[in-house]
Amino acid sequence: LFTYCLGRIAVPFFLMTTGFFVLAPYAKSGFRDKRRLVRFLRQNTLLYLAATLFYFPINWYAGNLPKNVLEFFKALLFDGTFYHLWYFPAVILGCLLVAILAKRSMRAGWIYAGIAYLIGLAGDSYYGLIQQIPALKACYDGIFSISNYTRNGIFFAPIYLLLGMAIANPRNRCSKTACRWGLPISVVFLLIEGYLTDLLHLQRHN
């Protein structure tokens, strides 16, 4: 529970801080001042490429190099070129998506992010239910032909980036009482969900 449940809070936290410090100022400027966003995307792209080169010998030694061009781009754009590097393409792609959608309409951004997150959740934590429905399983098989996970910048990242943008606005912040009660209650529900989805073998990836 602590390793595969509580430990997984880290990436959503990092995504929310990105929304808070990078995307919120872009929105506050009326979507005109792109400098901070462009700098963030450039720095993370360079970090991702550097990490990819660093882990290349390990991938080569382990026999995990992509076997064709499709697998290469799948790893580079969605899955990450090494297991834990999926965060980089997720935050880069997620930022681009949210920036485009939010500039058009914050409402459109929230609608997309909510639907995408539910689709992603069904393809990960609750895939054990989805695979029992042939039509839905076929749809997800199509998704998994492009990305091995729904835990990526299309499905997973946008909702947390938008949440970070939302709490950057003082009017959206919770009271101390709500935080004091909301945190422990939400952690309890998180642990219950993690325990049950593992116990019932619903998770596609732990």
Roles of regions detected by a PLM:
Residues 1-206:
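Alpha-helical transmembrane segments and their immediate juxtamembrane cytosolic regions
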